[in-house]
Each structure stands twice: as structure tokens, then as C-alpha cells.
From Swiss-Prot:
Expressed in heart and muscle. This is Regulator of G-protein signaling 5. PROSITE patterns: RGS. Inhibits signal transduction by increasing the GTPase activity of G protein alpha subunits thereby driving them into their inactive GDP-bound form. Binds to G(i)-alpha and G(o)-alpha, but not to G(s)-alpha. It is found in: Cytoplasm; Membrane. One of its GO terms (molecular function) is GTPase activator activity. The keyword Lyase does not apply. It holds the Pfam family RGS. GO terms for cellular component: cytosol; intracellular membrane-bounded organelle; membrane. Residues 64-180 form the RGS domain. InterPro entries: RGS, RGS_RGS5, RGS_sf, RGS_subdom1/3, RGS_subdomain_2. One of its GO terms (biological process) is negative regulation of signal transduction. The lineage of its organism: Eukaryota, Metazoa, Chordata, Craniata, Vertebrata.
């Protein structure tokens, strides 16, 4: 095995070391990893034509996840922060639910409901969100006859999780601190 590693280019070995470090951090107990910042080389995503928010707007985001999500610049910064922590699935699920509610066609709604369920809700889903068993069961029952409200309970649980967990971490992050400079 060592001969195989020695033959790899230096950049591959460096990348492997970075991944090993990140995985080590992720495998730590959550309490000890709360304030760790994982290095993230990309700059925060910024919408093409979004204006930089005022200091007053940015300060409001500390108190209101709604205001943060409604501001395109804030949304992009929050999304970049979550990506840096490998935890963007909650925001992606929330956005998928918002888009799902806008679907008018019952056929398209059923297709999208299945896609959301398979991507975020079912056990071992690629981007499985952290919801309790009761919420999962209710959501599954709602999908027998999909409606715009099929994911409401799960979406509310994930929103509350982002509000109580992700938002405070975002406000303590370098992403947010850069915005209030």
C-alpha cells in the first residue's frame, strides 16, 4: 500500500490529508466540535445582482432567521456557511419544501414529493435531515395523497433546528463577522 501512495502526485496526498483532518473533526463528539471552524477555501456565494446589505439589516439576522432567508445576500452567506460545515441539507430541504408548495399540477406535485422524500426524509437518504420518527411517520402518511402541506410538519421541525442551532453558529462564524465589518 505504501508504494501505491508514494506514486501519487503530491497534490493528491495533500488533498487526502485535508480530507482525513476534516473527517477526524466530523467524527468528534458534537459538544467538542461546536465552535470548531473547518477550513473552507471557497469564498461565500453571492448572488450576481444582490446588493450588500446594510449593517442594520445584517444585525437583524441575529434575531430572525426569516429576515436572513428573505435577503438574497444573507441567504447566500448562510448557505456558504452551512456548506463549510457540511450541513447544508437542512437549508436545501427547507428550500425544496418552499418550491414544492408552489407546484399546481397534482402529477408534478406527486413526483416532487417522491423526490423530496427519497432525497431528504427516508432512512439512509443521500441528504437525510434529522427529524424524529413521529414526524417521519406523519410525513409518510401525508404523501399518500400529496398536497402543498404534505411536508409542513417536517419543514417546521427543520426550520426550528436551523433557528436554534445553525443560526447561532452562523452568527459566531467568520462568514457573519465579515458582513458586520
Amino acid at each position: 500500500m505504501c508504494k501505491g501512495l508514494a506514486a501519487l502526485p503530491h497534490s493528491c496526498l495533500e488533498r487526502a490529508k485535508e480530507i482525513k483532518i476534516k473527517l477526524g473533526i466530523l467524527l468528534q463528539k458534537p459538544d467538542s466540535a461546536v465552535d470548531l471552524v473547518i477550513p473552507y477555501n471557497e469564498k461565500p456565494e453571492k448572488p450576481a445582482k444582490a446588493h450588500k446589505p446594510s449593517l442594520e439589516e445584517v444585525l437583524q439576522w441575529r434575531q430572525s432567521l426569516d429576515k436572513l432567508l428573505q435577503n438574497s445576500y444573507g441567504f447566500a452567506s448562510f448557505k456558504s456557511f452551512l456548506k463549510s460545515e457540511f450541513s447544508e441539507e437542512n437549508l436545501e430541504f427547507w428550500v425544496a419544501c418552499e418550491n414544492y408548495k408552489k407546484i399546481k399540477s397534482p402529477i408534478k406535485m406527486a413526483e416532487k414529493a417522491k423526490q423530496i422524500y427519497e432525497e431528504f426524509i427516508q432512512t439512509e437518504a443521500p441528504k437525510e435531515v434529522n427529524i424524529d420518527h413521529f414526524t417521519k411517520d406523519i410525513t409518510m402518511k401525508n404523501l399518500v395523497e400529496p398536497s402543498p402541506r404534505s411536508f409542513d410538519l417536517a419543514q417546521k421541525r427543520i426550520y426550528a433546528l436551523m433557528e436554534k442551532d445553525s443560526l447561532p453558529r452562523f452568527v459566531r462564524s467568520e462568514f457573519y463577522k465579515e458582513l458586520i465589518k
